[in-house]
């Protein structure tokens, strides 16, 4: 009797799915935070958690095993030098998935997946006066207000 495997197919062939997850994993390791669909984020989390756990061993064998799935020297180097040293003694749970609003075009469920210790608080800085545009009375054109008021 056929049994259902506990993995999402993501509407792709096995090779395409493997390549997609490898690319998402590489991008997550390089940029520390990526926006994708919720299903892809959940599948990427499984791969990334296993890779980081292997990388914590720090052996050459672990590095070769990880390189089999990632295939990007810079990402593997960054993983072993930067990410593993920053994650330190954390026992799993290296990633976080934050759900977003549905995508406009097709209403797909979207999410942000990020490495936990690299999460940056979003800046709530308002643009300065020199960045704001001011509408000129009587015309539809805008002028950028200079930093000095005397100009």
From Swiss-Prot:
Q: Which UniProt keywords are listed?
A: Ribonucleoprotein, Ribosomal protein
User: What InterPro entries does the annotation carry?
Assistant: Ribosomal_bL17, Ribosomal_bL17_CS, Ribosomal_bL17_sf
Q: Which SUPFAM superfamilies match?
A: Prokaryotic ribosomal protein L17
State the GO CC annotations.
cytosolic large ribosomal subunit
Q: Which Gene3D superfamilies match?
A: Ribosomal protein L17 (3.90.1030.10)
Biological process terms from the Gene Ontology for this record are: translation
Gene Ontology molecular function terms on file: structural constituent of ribosome
Can the keyword Transmembrane be found in this entry's annotation? no
Pfam families from the xrefs?
Ribosomal_L17 (PF01196)
Spans through the membrane: none
Specify whether Ribonucleoprotein is a keyword of the entry.
yes
Family statement drawn from the similarity comment of this UniProt entry? Belongs to the bacterial ribosomal protein bL17 family.
Write down the HAMAP family for this protein, in alphabetical order. Ribosomal_bL17
How does this protein assemble?
A: Part of the 50S ribosomal subunit. Contacts protein L32.
**The protein's name in its UniProt record:** Large ribosomal subunit protein bL17
Q: Which species is this UniProt entry from?
A: Chlorobium limicola (strain DSM 245 / NBRC 103803 / 6330)
Q: Which gene encodes it?
A: rplQ
């Amino acid at each position: 009797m056929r049994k259902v495997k506990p993995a999402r197919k993501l509407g792709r062939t096995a090779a395409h799915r493997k390549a997609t997850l490898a690319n998402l994993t590489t991008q997550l390791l390089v940029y520390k935070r990526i926006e994708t669909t919720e299903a892809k984020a959940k599948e990427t989390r499984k791969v990334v958690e296993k890779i980081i756990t292997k990388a914590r061993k720090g052996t050459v064998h672990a590095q070769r095993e990880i390189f089999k799935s990632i295939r990007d020297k810079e990402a593997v180097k960054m993983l072993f030098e930067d990410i593993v040293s920053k994650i330190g003694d954390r026992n799993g749970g290296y990633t976080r998935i934050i759900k977003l609003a549905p995508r406009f075009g097709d209403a797909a469920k979207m999410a942000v997946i990020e490495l936990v210790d690299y999460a940056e608080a979003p800046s709530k800085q308002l643009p300065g006066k020199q960045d704001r545009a001011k509408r000129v009375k009587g015309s539809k054109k805008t002028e950028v207000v200079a930093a000095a008021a005397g100009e």
